[in-house]
């Protein structure tokens, strides 16, 4: 596979480099501090609260006001017409899951500029879908790809290069080049996980070829670091900050954010005779942050079933798929 061309058209380069603020009187010393804090674009400054910016060492209230004013000149906070939003939505693209049936219920695949969450019990295909997307994201657009690189945050130690090789072979992609286009970080606690997400903002700003960010899984480390009801409030606050950052990244750099999530028993569902007695971890904070939510469960034999639980533009629907040596695929 050849190297990807730098994203230099309107579809991909939708952000302004933070160094453009020098034209509005912001010094390079302050810009370096912003980059170290993970704010690498003018849009990033615009999305950041004054409270967050004041936490950066050496930033006074007057300096933050000047910074916000400069960013506002470049990114005015105006209302847009529905027609303008419709035009902006044309920048959104989808990445194939490897299954046409699954792509169908998702409206084409995993969308950019939003968070897609898949949840389910073990052996349903969450990690296998993550590996499949690592390869399909690199495919040409006419094959359901996004022609770009992938960032993968592994919180459970389940990333396997051998799976990338097998999936690349299925799609006719050079395995070595496919692996070169994937960067992986292994997080061991929730603070490190947030650190990596912040660092990716800098990486995406410097290299406009990234199209997909995967976190597998989003809640695993939070469940370890925060245990018991006494720490639940703090956990949800930290989770909310992380998800807000992921949403900012997805819109700032027009990338697809794909997160896997674990499930927990739901005793209330059993009492109500509900068909599914499992619910995703993370509560309402997780539910509100994810634009698209997909439930994966075991079906008959080797089949798996995906149910679209929540989507802003697609109705609830189900489909079957299988896990093959070449990744997620349709039932034959």
Curated annotation (Swiss-Prot):
UniProt superkingdom: Eukaryota
Record's keyword annotation contains DNA-binding: yes
Binding-site residues for ATP, renumbered to this chain: 120-127
InterPro entries, sorted: AAA+_ATPase, Dmc1, DNA_recomb/repair_Rad51_C, DNA_recomb/repair_RecA-like, DNA_repair_Rad51/TF_NusA_a-hlx, P-loop_NTPase, RecA_ATP-bd, RecA_monomer-monomer_interface
Gene Ontology molecular function: any one: DNA strand exchange activity
Binding residue positions for dsDNA: 223, 229, 235
NCBIfam families: PRK04301.1 (NF003301), recomb_DMC1 (TIGR02238)
Name the UniProt record assigns to this protein: Meiotic recombination protein dmc1
